[in-house]
Amino acid sequence: RRASGAGRIRVNNAALGPAPGRELMTLPYRFGLPIHGWAHLRTGQRRPGRPISFSSTRTLKVEVRGVDEYCEDHGIDRVAFMKVDVEGFEARVLEGAARTIDSHRPSLLLEIEDRHLDKYGMTSADLADPLRERGYLMYAWHRGRWARVNSVTTARRNYLFAAQGGL
């Protein structure tokens, strides 16, 4: 358990976002079962998500925390890596992690898809460009390794952002 780091894992019943509060979350259902991987916060949503193949949705009121606030509250003094896959809400999660990103310079593995970002009025460039301006390099998994890329394409969904000299 110690070698795997499992003792440091904490499960929290909260969503991540730009600031603490309570927000509405949409939870899609398919064949009567919840599709948790497609759940998304409605904060700032400009249009409903595409009902790809779900038959209904449920609206939940959930606690939202910012990464910066969470780290301060739990005495976390080092963040090396963040995986953010939140159905288009990635920029808002990063907004709530601004101090953590600037001080710790963690590697960031982000799902970036215009079809999800669009519901919040954003594009892939709106998400990737500010990270590059902060000195992050962008990579995509290609032929068994992380390869440097300059833009987001529809051929890939996940992109690794690493501070210069960090990969």
What are these model-predicted stretches?
Residues 1-167:
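Phosphate/nucleotide-binding beta-alpha loop and adjacent structural elements of enzyme active sites
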